[in-house]
Amino acid sequence: MAGQPLACQLQEEVTCPICMEILQDPVTIDCGHNFCLQCISQVGKTSEKIQCPLCKLSVNKNTFRPNKLLASLAEKIQSMDPADIQAEKEDSRCQRHKEKLHYFCEQDGAFLCVVCRDSKDHKSHNVTLIDEAAQNYKVQIESQAQDLGQKDKKIIEEKKQGEGAIWAFRAQVDLEKLKIHEEFKLLRQRLDEEESFLLSRLDWLEQQGAKQLRQYVTVTEKQLNSLRKLTKSLKIRLQSSSMELLKDIKDALSRGKEFQFLNPNPVPEDLEKKCSEAKARHESIIKTLTELKDDMNAEGKRDKSAFMNSLNKEEKESWSLLQKNNSVLPTSVPVTLDKSSADPDLTFSQDLKKVTLYIVAGKASNRQAKPRPFYPFHCVRGSPGLSSGRQVWEAEIRGPSGGACIVGVVTELARGAQSQTVSAQSYIWALRISPSGCQPFTNCKAQEYLQVCLKKVGVYVNHDCGEVVFYDAITSKHIYTFQTSFDGKVFPLFGLQVACSHITLSP
């Protein structure tokens, strides 16, 4: 029974060392040992001082203190089933010789009494006292526990690095998805623009053809009318008298002979040329698209075949389920720079993908008037913000001596924090990047310095999981992961410190 060892131990605690019975009216003497009041009182009757029967310390008789806790415990022990206590006592004795167990055999891992120790079964074995053996193993256990503790720390660190590597991998996947979305979006946009231009040009040529038809009909009808008038005048002359017929006859005949049909060109060469150019452009596009389709068809089949052959059974099932559900995971959108949130010393490219720090002396008063919540960095937020889901972007850093900057995320709470007791820097999770390395920074506290030289850093944010992952965008190696929880929307954050340095975003 699980309670038997405890029962035996408790009985030993409430046993009087003098009478070896359960304590009666237990008292504690100055040295701390406990006895029956009657038993200890019988020691040294003729003297005011006695020697403790256990430790031999001299104590005064009049200092005996009743021990109510032991008295209560003794009562409880006495109320227990004696069979349980006796069974425990038997467990501490040799089952074969009924002697008390004092020794431990290393070879057999068995407890021995004196008789067992001297027997032929154990005489040649390494036998030590139980307490000594326990002490030896205690040292081994402590050493092993310490080793396991070190392994625990190592596993935790490797787990942290492994999780970071997985987050960096997921960031790469999301970034590749974003690039594909953007490239195909641009391709579709370019095709739509090309289609629109080709059709618009043909619509215009059609309009010009209709206009040319009207002009051609007008010109030819006008000439026909002139010809018919001339013919009619000659026929009338035939019906007149001889004198009337001969009057101005030469002029009349001359007009008939000189009449020429001015046959205009139905379709001008300029329109013919424009139509030919449209057809040529269309044929060129069709040829390019046909080659692209053929190439994509061949390469696509090879790529799909290689991909499917690389999957095991379980992976194929998950792939089939994904295709069946047609559930494409949501992807993030490209990040641009928000000029409205920018430090006045920052300038931007037209596409809002590049920010450069130009410190102009004449703007000093403006800089002093406008608070710099992320001093000494000149900062700008990115757009759009993120209130759920994931977002990924990469930032290339350039400038004198490699530049110095911060890249990370900031919550919308940072806007009003600078005017209150809380610093705006309490709401950022970022890397301070310098030519010699980088340093994670959050809640106004810098973390350990990392000997990682970055030229291009990737940032992956999972709002739902509270993860901000940084990775080397060139090597794809994980750098650092913040694990937190976001209160509201978060935004990309970029800051520059060195004049003429710049950050370029992608995609």
UniProtKB/Swiss-Prot annotation:
GO cellular component: mitochondrion
ZnF region ranges: B box-type: 89-130
Start-end of RING-type zinc fingers: 16-56
GO molecular function, one term: ubiquitin protein ligase activity
Domain B30.2/SPRY: 315-507
Alphabetical GO biological process terms: antiviral innate immune response; defense response to virus; host-mediated suppression of symbiont invasion; inflammatory response; innate immune response; negative regulation of NLRP3 inflammasome complex assembly; protein K48-linked ubiquitination; ubiquitin-dependent protein catabolic process
Pathway, per record: Protein modification; protein ubiquitination
Changes seen on gene knockout: Mice are viable, normal in size and without gross physiological or behavioral abnormalities. Mice are however more susceptible to infection with RNA virus due to impaired cellular antiviral response. Mice also show increased inflammatory response, characterized by enhanced NLRP3 inflammasome activation. Increased NLRP3 inflammasome activation leads to an aggravation of alum-induced peritonitis. In contrast, it attenuates the severity of dextran sodium sulfate-induced colitis, an inflammatory bowel diseases model in which NLRP3 possesses protective roles.
Induction: Up-regulated in response to lipopolysaccharid and IL1B treatment.
Enzyme class label: transferase
Keywords from the named record: Antiviral defense, Coiled coil, Cytoplasm, Immunity, Inflammatory response, Innate immunity, Metal-binding, Mitochondrion, Transferase, Ubl conjugation, Ubl conjugation pathway, Zinc, Zinc-finger
Record function comment: E3 ubiquitin-protein ligase that acts as a regulator of antiviral immune response and inflammation by mediating ubiquitination of substrates. Acts as a regulator of innate immune defense against viruses by mediating 'Lys-63'-linked ubiquitination of MAVS, promoting MAVS polymerization and formation of three-stranded helical filaments on mitochondria. Acts as a negative regulator of the NLRP3 inflammasome by catalyzing 'Lys-48'-linked ubiquitination of NLRP3, leading to its degradation. Regulator of Src-induced anchorage independent cell growth.
Name by which UniProt lists this protein: E3 ubiquitin-protein ligase TRIM31
